[in-house]
């Protein structure tokens, strides 16, 4: 492929200084960002006669022009390169697609502080513990905290509305400060102990509780002493389950395994010498990328992520050494304005943690490769059965979900040769049709999917329709209209359930000929079709349920004059749900913040009809 780029002419203008270069394709998209200590030397290497790397050959064949930015130092170049990669997400760079902010446990600054799950900017006044590797780890920790420390986890609106203890008090998971079941001093003491525990100082917590238990026993307050005893026993059980290292402090331990184009970075988050959590990352790696670039790109993007800068430890231990390690240390230290070191040759506890991280990374890659190979085999068998001339690169499946015609949602899921490609999934809220008309819903969904399709768009090789011949005919009609001027169109296949609707009894129908066929119930090709069909059904029904719930809550309350989103939210939170709002008296409605007695009467009358 020729793009008209004159490399020799361009190289004559390039400086030998440090800097960053951006490579563009003919459409003006940035396809690669790189940095160099000597730009002229680095860029010249792309245009040698013998390029051994397939990735580099493919990259060079698409270059239309190159922009260069000079920097004061190699460290500055490294930081600017990272900024450009985040900005442009070039297809030939290693990309860490991890745009979620990290979750925390939040302890509020309130007369009676609450513990809560938090994700997002740290704006509210209080104490933030974390970040945790994922939301599940936070929820698990909060559940544990309820058993150890009777501190409220309800929101402030619910707290203010209580006139008697809730179920959490009956379960001994909250001391009910909302209704005065505990003194402020006792509650504050539990908050202090919980805070120490979240900081990893469980030995100090146990020591303080032992002292309180002995004091209570001396004063013959045996019931209180028994509560402290139970709390101590629970804390000791938790402490015994945690792996502890005596002198490691705070650090991240990273095991790396890279094989067959799949890279896994398994991180152990060590805080106060304990495994605080773990998480695997799978950066997008272009084919033929060397391990040096994979390591450097991941570490730079991960540790300069704005969401985690507040809690980056000073020390990182990683399983692989690489050439630019010290330059990367300097760049991250400069960006964060704090000491940052990367170690690869470690002993004792650090070596033990590193072996654990590396084992997890290796197992993760092997599992992915096994899954990838299984999916690949299923694709090959499906291609043979369908007698296709070219490999299947993309499959899509549509499904419709509604309840008696209410809140109809269509789903489109996408599979490539590695399995589900969830970034490409789409949902369509269906509007303007007769409720329950699945044919009209399918027509609208397919029309919207291919409304602006052209030869450069993402055209599926196979398009599955979860339904019978009627829906398939509608879909085929729309596809014929949309692709009339294009050389390629998807092959439509309907997936009709058998009379008993049992898996394995599906009938498959070609959209163009309407001829049908079936596969053996143990056929791997059928399993692939069932997988994409089931995934489409799951994605559709989840979207439908979410839309239905939102519609029911919103339309019922917001149709009442004077009730907007804020008052609707206050009513639902304060009273616990729509049914509770419907069953509430005027007096109960008037207790909700922002609801006057007149407004309460209006709501009561509207909901009671």
UniProtKB/Swiss-Prot annotation:
Residues 203-238 form the UVR domain. Interacts with UvrB in an incision complex. GO terms for biological process: nucleotide-excision repair; SOS response. It is found in: Cytoplasm. GO terms for molecular function: DNA binding; excinuclease ABC activity. The UvrABC repair system catalyzes the recognition and processing of DNA lesions. UvrC both incises the 5' and 3' sides of the lesion. The N-terminal half is responsible for the 3' incision and the C-terminal half is responsible for the 5' incision. It holds the Pfam family UVR. Belongs to the UvrC family. This is UvrABC system protein C. GO terms for cellular component: cytoplasm; excinuclease repair complex. The keyword DNA damage applies. Its main location: cytoplasm. Coiled coil: none annotated. The keyword Secreted does not apply. Keywords: Cytoplasm, DNA damage, DNA excision, DNA repair, Excision nuclease, SOS response. CDD domains: GIY-YIG_UvrC_Cho. Residues 16-94 form the GIY-YIG domain.
